[in-house]
Amino acid sequence: GAELFDLHVNNLFKQGVNPEEVAAFIIESYQGWGAVFYPNDYIQAMREWSEKHDSLLIVDEIQSGFGRTGKLFGYEYYGVEPDLIMCGKGISGSLPLSAVLGRSELIELDPTLTSTHGGQPMSCAAALGHLESFVEDKLVDRAEKLGKKLLGWLNEWKDEFPDRIPFISGYGMVWAIFICKPGSKELDADFTDQLVEK
């Protein structure tokens, strides 16, 4: 993980990027197409690099935030604190609303900043009710517990079909089953489509 981050960042520098001009790294806490989480030490190396070079670590939690991974935010699996967190979708349960969370010294730099979906009253009211249900119904804990059950079932499938399911990926209620061509690690899109149709 950390070595891979070093390789990636050094490739940027070889292409002419000046390390002192890197304002921020912006990442999703996982890649949604396959519930692919980064290695912990990759993100930790990114955090260390950001601190050393006075740049920001910004995490996009628009898709991954609000409990679906078994933690309130997906970045919590990495043991780092981002400087800014971008939120949307899950914050209100369905209505258009976005938010940027972060360290107060950054948020207070320009209090006039606004956004299209940042303060619409109906969406804000829905978000408050939605967030209350997270606490009252312990939805994050529930996602974590159900995720452990789901992992057990997925591992049973993986054990039953090792030729087709070489690996699974995810946390909480976010999982991907990688269905591959028999005996290989090449994804089998046609077979996957047939399964989805059934």
For each feature predicted by the language model, list its residue ranges.
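Conserved N-terminal phosphate-binding loop of PLP-dependent enzymes in the Aspartate aminotransferase
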Residues: G1-K198
